[in-house]
């Protein structure tokens, strides 16, 4: 079932999502060569709790960390660890909070030091495709319009769209209906209505679209071990168009 939110509920969601954006901003101050991804997880958990919220990923279906941190060829759901970031890495940070009974969710892929130009181009295209998808998140469109916009933008530039993982509705639960794929056909899928809140999150690979799941049961990486990028915003569909909730 798709739950439509009232204006008041969307304002409460904005608080949880704004904190996610603030957390990403705090992490950006620390992402550099020489820091471990586990240290970033600790920084995020303390920041979220200090701001009166709960890290919503921690314990979700048994996930053991506050952040999903995925480095280079890892696509999503990577575990923070003792891995020390080095110059040239790219790191996807997926962060969720719960505040006032509502969830926030956002992801951003950061460059660590000097990154190869072709990898930076992948990150730019993935981020731009997110906004192409958001442009289609308007009342009267369908979920397929979002996926088509993301897929078309990325594939025209020679990148591939991960199929196994998709965006989702968001509200009192981290994952609600509907699923929001990053691929699709215009005019298909669930109808977008005022009050829907969805997380749009392109996961785009430099090489093949194919992925594999690591032995930890969570981490997803590209099969060909080429880099991947991941950007995400939580968005409310309003009578005035899409409203990005995770933006500062």
Mark where each language-model region is.
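Active-site neighborhoods and metal-handling regions in enzymes and metal-associated proteins
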Residues: 1-248
